[in-house]
Design a protein with these regions (language model features):
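ABC ATP-binding cassette signature C-motif
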Residues: 1-121, 170, 174-397
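ABC ATPase nucleotide-binding domains
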Residues: 117-139, 144-153, 169, 389-397
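Short, amphipathic alpha-helical segments that act as regulatory/interfacial helices
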Residues: 132, 156-159, 366
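Short amphipathic alpha-helical coiled-coil/interface segments
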Residues: 1, 150-159
Length: 397
């Protein structure tokens, strides 16, 4: 029991606390621990990593891989599903496809399947066009009556070949031009924060340079979102925290979705902020963020929380800013949409700060990691996997 709770991020001091004292995210961890300890024959997990930090996700992966039980998981965490699964089931367009493959292998197999579908679809469409032409040409010819009737019946009974939805992950989202910020968008000197006398972090001395792409990582409750709110001026910190010259911030947090105008449609929301060449790709962008077809005509007020989150992120990406701060942006995104977002952020020439536990999303995106823990913030000049390896080496020493 202790190993499971510690693995999922609890402290020993938490063991005797009433569950009513914990936040919703921590209660989800407690429920997950209870489920794992029951040792069921089949484990059904729906987005189990959403409320976990990077360390806890790694522990859960090891737990599942070392278990002999069957596991069925729904997840948008590519690294997680690649590490724990050997079979991928795709549900698309009213059909189910079963692949004896990891997610990465499935992507290649799906691509081959779609190419085959497209070839069969094009052949069928040519056959349909030829048949309709024959019917039109000979429908008044007595000697061809039986052949015409036969072809009409054939078309009526024909089962049309459907082609899987196109992969939108290659879609490139171009940021609007924004004014250049100063060389140091954010500077911190002896920054500290506490709540009700309890220290969250102290002695933070960090300089964010223009063009940096930085990940904030650490266990939940260690102050990642708190420092973001200090940068945004939403919380008053101790010490000195300064924004650089001409810094224009674009900020996303889960509550940003509630600030959208509920009376506008999805399309109008994006149309209002889209400028330049991107205006010609609004529908493609909406499709990439899962608002294709009639979904784009829905009013914002009828969207679910996850749908509003997706729309808020897309809207933010189209606004001219030079410092992007994203707090858990991938929680409501599917894998393809995450790819579109990641590519957009790679192309972004401003400064990026992202709070995330999604290792695949952070891999190749960030070149600095700020680690939050034990009341401190440590700076690591490396990507997320180099950081993870350094932490493993520390734990062995």
């Amino acid at each position: 029991v202790e190993n499971t709770l510690l693995g999922l991020g609890c402290e020993r001091s938490d063991f005797t606390r009433p569950t009513s004292e914990f936040s919703g995210g921590w209660r989800m961890r407690i429920e997950l621990a209870k489920l794992l300890l029951k040792s069921p024959d089949v484990l059904l997990l729906d987005e189990p990593t959403n409320h976990l930090d990077i360390e806890s996700i790694g522990w859960l992966e090891d737990f599942i891989c070392n278990s002999s039980k069957a596991v069925v998981v729904i997840s948008h965490d590519r690294k997680f599903v690649d590490d724990i699964t050997t079979r991928t089931i795709e549900v698309t367009m009213g059909r189910i496809y079963d692949y004896k493959a990891t997610y990465s292998q499935y992507l290649e197999l799906r691509k081959e399947r779609r190419e085959q579908q497209m070839k069969q679809y094009e052949e069928q469409q040519k056959m349909i066009a030829d048949t309709k032409e024959f019917i039109e040409r000979f429908k008044g010819t007595y000697s061809k009556t039986l052949q015409v009737q036969s072809r009409v019946k054939m078309l009526e009974k024909l089962q049309l070949i459907e082609v899987d939805e196109e992969d939108t992950s290659r879609l490139r989202l171009k940021f609007p031009p924004s004014p250049r910020s100063g060389a140091y968008p954010v500077q911190m000197s002896e920054v500290a924060m506490s709540f009700d006398g309890k220290n969250v972090f102290s002695g933070v001395n960090l300089t964010v340079e223009r063009g940096d792409k930085i990940a904030f990582v650490g266990r939940n409750g260690e102050g990642k979102s708190t420092l973001v709110k200090c940068i945004m001026g939403q919380l008053q910190n101790e010490g000195k925290l300064e924004l650089g010259h001409n810094v224009q911030i674009g900020y996303f947090a889960q509550n940003q979705a509630s600030l959208l105008d509920g009376e506008l449609t999805v399309f109008q929301t994006i149309d209002d902020v889209a400028k330049g060449d991107v205006r010609n790709k609004i529908r493609d962008l909406l499709g990439a963020f899962m608002f294709g077809g009639e979904e784009s005509t829905k009013k914002v007020k009828v969207l679910s929380g996850g749908e509003r989150t997706r729309l808020a992120i897309l809207k933010l990406l189209l606004e001219p800013v030079n410092l992007l701060i994203l707090d858990e942006p991938t929680n409501h995104l599917d894998l393809k949409t995450k790819d579109v977002l990641k590519q957009a952020l790679l192309d972004f020439d401003g400064t990026l700060i992202v709070v995330s536990h999604d290792r695949d999303f952070l891999d190749g995106l960030v070149s600095k990691v700020y680690e939050f823990g034990h009341g401190r913030v440590r700076e690591h000049w490396c990507g997320i996997y180099e950081f993870r390896e350094s932490k493993k080496m520390e734990s062995r020493q």
